[in-house]
Amino acid sequence: TVKGLLKFFNRYFSKDKHFCGKLSSMLGYTPAHLELYVQAFKHKSNSVEVNGHRQHNERLEFLGDAILNSIVAEYLYKKYPNGDEGFLTKMRSKIVKRKTLDAIGARMGIDDLMTIMNKTQISRSMLGNALEALVGAVYLENGYAFTRKFIVLEILRKYLDIHDDIELAIKHMP
């Protein structure tokens, strides 16, 4: 298939093959549309102009933020069928807040991918934004159902101890 050929080319012959190898290890698959992921890790301070438009990760970050919020809300809704709106909102807020996403991004190795794609110093506060942009890229390439599975299996279950967060949230409930 064409998608299979693109994946093969990206993995072995692309000028970004080092980036593609690290990205593939993180994602668990080789992306066919590598340019989406290159853009996801391109910070605005290191943007380039293509056809009169600056290329950086902010638009993908916007999209990924919305998708991440939606999927986390659905996940919590299903996982805690007796949780009221306040509890579910607090839990979602704890998961998608900048500090949490920055920490997840660091644990995932997003800083390594950003270092490859940027010539500027990478700060920890950029990692959560890049994680959201990554979610946006995964969504554009693979659709909602795949992205939901990716977020639940590769982010929520792998990098968050939601049970500890639940205990903490319960202790602070009125």
Regions found by a protein language model. Name each.
Residues 1-174:
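Double-stranded RNA-binding/processing signature
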